[in-house]
Amino acid sequence: MAKWQRSFFQPVLPLGEDGRRVTGSKEHIALSRMAAGEGMVLLKNEKNTLPIRKGTKVALFGKGTVDYVKGGGGSGDVTVEYIRNLYEGMKIKEDEGKVEVFDKLAKYYEEDIQKQYADGAVPGMTVEPELPDELLNEAREYTDTAIITICRFSGEGWDRKCEAAQDGYVLDGEEKRNSELSAKIFENGDFCLTNAENAMVEKVKKTFPHVIVVMNVGGIVDTKWFRDCDEIQSVLMAWQGGMEGGLATADILCGDVNPSGKLSDTYAKNLEDYPSTANFHESAFYVDYTEDIYVGYRYFETIPGAAERVNYPFGFGLSYTDFDWKVTGASEENGVITVLTEVTNTGKTAGKEVIQLYYGAPQGKLGKPAKVLGAFKKTSILQPGERQILTLKIPVNQMASYDDLGKVCKSAYVLEAGEYAIYIGTNVRDAAKIDFTYVVKEDTVTEQLSRKAAPYHLQKRMLADGSYEELPQREYVEEEGLPRQDKYAIGLPCPDTRGQKGIDFLDFLDSKGVHFSDVADGKMTLDEFMDILTLDDCINLLGGQPNTGCANTFGMGNLPEYGVPNVMTADGPAGLRILPKCGVNTTAWPCATLLASTWDEELVEKVGKAGAEEVKENNISIWLTPACNIHRSPLCGRNFEYYSEDPYLAGKTGAAMVRGIQSQHIGASVKHFAANNKETNRKDSDSRVSERALREIYLKQFEIIVKEAHPYTIMSSYNLINGIHASENKELLTGILRDEWGFDGLVTTDWWTFGEHYRETKAGNDIKMAAGYPERIKEAYEKGLITEAEIRLSARRILNMILKID
């Protein structure tokens, strides 16, 4: 196929064999189902209640039985042919002769939920109906086994238990509507059960001797109500499993799949136990990251007294079988520590196990978390009695800490003198210290850098003993420039966009005498092509372009007279997002949190590859995924799009996704760079974070992805970082991303940012989406506020990215 033919030729050209479409294909849907099963986490299984024995009769309780949430809202939503809920999944198992389902109860929920849908409700944002005693008693006469399903939904643009801040910020528009609806349904906040759900659970517990709970959620929720409850024997964290999530859940409940997922977050006893909760809603205009590097398990495993406030530790997950493991070797060579671990299936069922390596650095002058994830491996399916040796490697320099205040060596990654312990286990809590210690004889600088993106107004941060240290304060003085535009005017489309000139564009004879395909064919260099472009041509490249075909998030490029295609972009993290009006059904993949919970890089790469095939088949060139922000707080409404509280797990999962996507010569757009951990007032909220926490926690996953997977594009975030919009932050986008990490791709804004276009270009943000402001760039250029070289550099990066795409 000719270069960029899909950008010019709008009818879909199938990628499958014999002219078949791969979009929403049986093969892709089967992969989605399999991935969902791999990431679901068995939290509890007393008396081996699961898997359900063949022939067992079951009664399905809770609206979540039919009100299935495949994924979150916003960019993570996907248009699909169908969504399989748990009732439908269990009916398939009934047809296979494995269980029998009490239909009357399920039909009761089905009728109620359909009425709520007809009144405008969306999955997960419905009210739990009252459970009639008569129906409860009929169900008990039918069976002694109950399955309760609890579901939750959240989405882009609003946070969980969203509150009006103390500083006068007023919720408006979608934020206000979603927050008010959530408050109406979830009177205790959606972290906890509603009063109606509590009443239903209590009835079921008192009536049935065998109770199983399924959690169809996208993030952290309350676990107290089942953690130590003897009346509830089994709990499956089923997450939001995509379009086949209900069937994937049934696969596990009935024993067709042995659960092997592990938590990618720490589940505390109470919402208030997370250090981020106290100030999450303190202000709509800023968030102080005072817990610093002590996020998730780094907090709970380190801070005195915090460990006892954990219900389920990071990395935890049960299986239907048992495993033993032992370290068979540990050594260091050429700066890399290698640990060999033999895993044996000692149970009666085939299954998989995940071995996790943590390191513990000496406290020294900087202070460190007690344990930090350094490597992990998942076994293949092990039959009873079968064993496998896993090789886990960690570079010594990975254990270094960043010194932002000069306690050892300012603005440097440092290995402080002392013993570095290595722990091996199947979760952070049970990881045991092995008989190997790496010793650093003297303080060693592993990488000397310079201060970048440091805070101005963060007053204090947490230390390893739970106390706080004061931080130096600075004043930020913005560089002189054009008077800033009204923020909400910036959100309007720019009128100066350029339409595509026809679909049979490969045969178009342009009037410039050159064609961009000459660069792709090696007939001329990109620099030679750039020399032909005028300054106006370059400025026109710096903004998003109109949609073509089924795209709905705009394009990039589009200089028809030079043969530069208008390459389309599309959401999102859970699959190719095409508006329903286009009539294209795609595959809805499991949410990002579930994918991270597989702890399986190879599987995630397969999902990325399959998703990219659908993107490519529908003439899209850039897929706006993966989303890699840290789960700082359970209250962030967009956590379902993100992988983990841990940057290493998030980075390795994200890198696998990018490798899979870009194997199809489709550009992945890794987002949201960076510290985008709150949706309320997301375009104007300042993330105040120390440089150490920024580098070790909130940038580290992006660094891993950039260095291991080489993404074509990075998307800067809406929020400010230490007083400067991320899209205008030169220290972040040029100093760290490009100069330190070696990123050679394109940086795009998120859609309709509040940043000034010319300031974004100067910072290294190459293109403003969904549309640019060429008149502002021209005005800034004429007043000497931006140079032609800066404009041409961003234009060149855009063209270079297009050259990488089929």
Q: Where do the PLM segments sit?
A:
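Short beta-strand elements
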Residues: 430-449
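Glycoside hydrolase catalytic-domain context in secreted enzymes
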Residues: 1-430, 451-806
